[in-house]
Swiss-Prot record:
Comment on bound cofactor: Binds 1 Fe(2+) or Fe(3+) and 1 Zn(2+) ion per subunit. Electron spin resonance indicates the presence of a mixture of protein molecules that contain either Fe(2+) or Zn(2+).
Example of a GO MF term: zinc ion binding
Pathway: Secondary metabolite metabolism; methylglyoxal degradation; (R)-lactate from methylglyoxal: step 2/2
Entry superkingdom: Eukaryota
Primary gene name: GLX2-1
Catalytic activity reported: an S-(2-hydroxyacyl)glutathione + H2O = a 2-hydroxy carboxylate + glutathione + H(+)
Protein name: Hydroxyacylglutathione hydrolase 1, mitochondrial
Protein source organism: Arabidopsis thaliana
Length: 331
């Protein structure tokens, strides 16, 4: 069985979720999307290719969290809000409507999280960290001191995540206000990287393991570790919502289109992302189904990708992944 699911020879547009308006606001939650993209595919792709590769340094101003729906298509009391933080990072507020329990995933800084909590008049119960890098834990100390929140992270990072209280490891099951959270050990970007999977809400928080159309750098891990970790994402149900650590889809699309320009599903996704970003809306969450159809790091068996990057058929999956990463870094 291959580590990454085999790329299909033909891709269709059925993988791309749509978007809908709820309560007069644009909702970007997969499964509820029915956005009418009247602009042509060519317009969307050309707009995307004309965008500069830069971070969203003004993210808190352009991506106001009040613009985001927190409506789930799952019969769950768990609601999620995106909180833009420094550069292009996202933190995520988790709110259980039944108990009032609130958590935050990967707060790179405290101020925007405090602002969001104050606006909602919420207290913070938990801080969930996927890994130890400062742009995912930078707000820990201030938030813990202010709210008395418990910090949760990998046991591997017990000496690298400030204020950590609850140590978790692969296959652990932790409860967030009655919601089962399965801990996936997902090294590659870092040795202690974990992902938080909420099966009841079809949601996973992946930090810097996987982005829409890309994956994290190998800061501490190996290609083999990254492949194994990505397989854990691929094995989840197709409708699983992926909340990654960054808003970098537009830049990732440029590379993905360059190595697989004939992928029709990717072309359709480019149009949708271009429309969302032109409206100042996030491209996240994505879904497992979309990433399997479009993400070159999950499509390392694609003949088109291998041909584009001169990767021989004899190359192992780990070697192919390494070459794709090198090509992305040079892009």
């Amino acid at each position: 069985m291959p580590v990454i699911s085999k790329a299909s020879s033909t891709t269709t547009n059925s993988s791309i979720p749509s978007c809908s308006r709820i309560g007069g606001q644009l909702c970007v939650w997969p499964g509820l999307r029915q956005l009418c993209l009247r602009k042509s595919l060519l317009y969307g792709v050309m707009w995307l290719l004309s965008m500069p590769l830069k971070t969203l340094r003004g993210a808190r101003k352009t991506l106001k969290i009040t613009h985001f729906c927190s409506i789930s298509n799952m019969p769950s009391s768990l609601k999620i809000e995106l909180v833009p933080c420094s550069k292009d990072n996202y933190a995520y507020l988790l709110h259980d409507e039944d108990t009032g329990t609130v958590g935050v995933v990967d707060p790179s800084e405290a101020a925007p999280v405090i602002e969001a909590l104050s606006r909602k008049n919420w207290n913070l119960t938990y801080i969930l960290n996927t890994h130890h890098h400062d742009d995912h834990i930078g707000g820990n100390a201030e938030l813990k001191e202010r709210y008395g929140a418990k910090v949760i992270g990998s046991a591997v990072d017990k000496d690298r995540i400030p204020g950590i209280d609850i140590l978790l490891k692969d296959s652990d099951k932790w409860m967030f206000a009655g919601h089962e959270v399965r801990i996936l050990d997902t090294p590659g970007h870092t040795q202690g990287h974990i992902s938080f999977y909420f099966p009841g809400s079809a949601t996973i928080f992946t930090g810097d393991l996987i982005y829409s159309l890309s994956c994290g750098t190998l800061s501490e891990g190996t290609p083999e570790q990254m492949l194994s970790s990505l397989q854990k994402i691929v094995s989840l149900p197709d409708d699983t919502n992926i909340y990654c650590g960054r808003e970098n889809t537009a830049g990732n699309l440029k590379f993905a289109l360059s190595v697989e320009p004939k992928n029709e599903t990717l072309q359709s996704y480019a149009t949708r992302v271009a429309h969302l970003r032109s409206q100042g809306l996030p491209s996240i969450p994505t879904t497992v189904k979309v990433e399997k159809a479009c993400n070159p790091f999950l499509r390392i068996s694609s003949k088109d990708i291998r041909k584009s990057l001169s990767i021989p058929d004899s190359a192992t999956e780990a070697e192919a992944l390494r070459r794709i990463q090198r090509a992305r870094d040079r892009f």
